[in-house]
């Protein structure tokens, strides 16, 4: 038996490469304690090296004593809420979540704001067995066996190539130089401790072909006149040997695939020697040998030099003498000659200084992924991945980010849809920067044609007019509160209407409600009560106000004027008569005439005018066929649209503060917002998540619109201007939080400042509100400091973060409350505020928003 072992050992030594010299230590009797450096490696399968092709050694795992079950108390609801709140704000004591966020934040800062400080990279470049060189261009020196502690000897792994066991130094650039990997004792860790090792990504067993694919291949072979068996053999034999892991049903972790051919016990050597010829080598068929003889020009890949880019792309370590490296596609199978492997990795540009980076730094900038298909629903249904996943599918999963920009995509879809519907329904206003005038001859209320002019502001965004945008939900103060000036304007118009009467033309051509000055004394009769004999009685006395064309309390049935519900003396408080008892012959001149004018709401300030339908349509007004007086209609309700007011006299559409965030002035305006969202907003949402970004986006936009409604109350504004500046404030906060680790923070600061100043100057154009920009930016700063968890530098910084969250939340709530008080209780009228948001380069460049400027 011992002779057989010696034969197997000598046979195995003959198979060893001639350039590999190893000194195997003598067997040491088992000690009471394990060596300190082998304590982490509890499994014997970890004690294998990769000096020979891997095999699955049947080594029994050491016996583990059964652990006692540790009973733990279930966390209370208060502790769960407290821990969840701390995690959400980024001040949790959980080191894993904190390190995860720090890795994402530093990676985002390095990509957006530039290079990090050298000392930051030096601090991150810790001496670890996981460190790796990205270039992999260093060739180790010849094998050397030196002394080691604990009676063991060190083994130099020739295949490590500077991948592992890098030590930190104090160079100027913060990068460390690789050292020769030293494997303690018989455990060669260089091949599986590095993240660049090929055993991190073991090749998977090829899937079985479908019936359709095999049928198609068979038909193609018959058409070409080839044998189906030959094609199958050529496709199947592309490796010098099949890895033993392919024969197993379940894929195990990479340390179990390491070989112990040179360093394991004698029993293991005998077992591996007996199974080595059967499981490793495959004898090529005669057809394959004939194909190889026919193509002698094909280069053998065994022992060839690998290009550096190819090595880094495939993440495969260099093969052994009898390796299983895949040949080029289409290459025939050839016997593998026993030649010495080349230890160089070819690089076109050669090794360059400063191109190596350690694994902790690589993990720092590695994108944290959310497992595809294993989200919240996957956790509830106990969903898991299968044991073997195709490499292409796995690569797609690894390319996905941790946070998906759901809010960005939803917002972009809503913006695009609303803009398309608005343009299709309301059309496109005249394009330009000035005012557009339209002149036409229109039939007026007096029964004659007159030349009238309609003026409207041009829209250079290629979109609807301002009246249409207000009707859709734009920010407009008179629709959100009872504006004092608009309300006084409406009350003055009602007072004039109170003293009006029906003007009946003498030729019986028509009548219209008007004042005495507008009624011709020679061509018409002004039927004014109580002077005119047709005046009705009220409580035994003649009515003092009236008459009203086509409305009289004596002939109206619904609503009827009966005691105790008699119509009041003031005609501006009369209701609309929906049913009349008499026809066209009442012997009352104001009732038997043909009415030529009814109320029409024109403009955006609640102006009502008794006029003809033709004139109302020409002025893009809202004509009321059912009413006879302007006091019977509520023009602000018509102008604002959306949901009717609870009290027709008091506008209450406060929801315009956030509804206008989803509207745009035109197609170009929407394209600008989409570009911003798909670049800046999506990137930040991938970093912070949709919930934080949605809170900052909406609250910043609401605050910006509220400030704009205070200082520019009569200007219709749409678009997420305040929200976008709030998102820009997030970038500033991120820069301030990462100031200590950036190499050139001032450069990044001035770049962001230049972008903000450019957008602020862009807000001097019409239809863009700088007050929303400023308020949205300030509120975005407060919200970003409160809701975005960023890097903490020590325990003191963690406590500072907690105080910062409370302070900035209180400051933001104070800012919002102050703006609400100013808007509803202490209205502000600012004369010069318009120049801050629109500079009048010409007389008609900026639209006049004063109430006395009747543009419509």
Swiss-Prot record:
Keywords: Endoplasmic reticulum, Glycoprotein, Golgi apparatus, Membrane, Phosphoprotein, Transmembrane, Transmembrane helix
Record's GO cellular component terms: endoplasmic reticulum membrane; Golgi membrane
Region Disordered: start-end pairs: 1-21
Modified residues (Phosphothreonine): 180, 183
Residues annotated as transmembrane: 413-433, 657-677, 693-713, 716-736, 748-768, 774-794, 805-825
Regions of this protein lying in the Lumenal compartment: 434-656, 714-715, 769-773, 826-856
Record topology, Cytoplasmic segments: 1-412, 678-692, 737-747, 795-804
Glycosylation: residue positions: 584
Molecular function in Gene Ontology: serine-type endopeptidase activity
GO biological process per UniProt: cell migration; cell population proliferation; negative regulation of protein secretion; regulation of epidermal growth factor receptor signaling pathway; regulation of proteasomal protein catabolic process
Expressed in which tissues: Expressed in the duodenum, as well as in fetal liver and head.
Topological relation to the membrane, as annotated: Multi-pass membrane protein
A Pfam match: Rhomboid
Compartment list: Endoplasmic reticulum membrane; Golgi apparatus membrane
Modified positions (Phosphoserine) in chain numbering: 76, 176, 391
Main localization, broad class: endoplasmic reticulum
Family statement: Belongs to the peptidase S54 family.
PANTHER family named among the record's database cross-references: INACTIVE RHOMBOID PROTEIN (PTHR45965), INACTIVE RHOMBOID PROTEIN 1 (PTHR45965:SF4)
Quaternary structure (record): Homodimer, or homooligomer. Interacts with TGFA and HBEGF. Interacts with EGF; may retain EGF in the endoplasmic reticulum and regulates its degradation through the endoplasmic reticulum-associated degradation (ERAD). Interacts (via cytoplasmic N-terminus) with FRMD8/iTAP; this interaction leads to mutual protein stabilization. Interacts with ADAM17/TACE.
Functional description taken from the UniProt entry: Regulates ADAM17 protease, a sheddase of the epidermal growth factor (EGF) receptor ligands and TNF, thereby plays a role in sleep, cell survival, proliferation, migration and inflammation. Does not exhibit any protease activity on its own.
The protein's name: Inactive rhomboid protein 1
Species of the source: Mus musculus
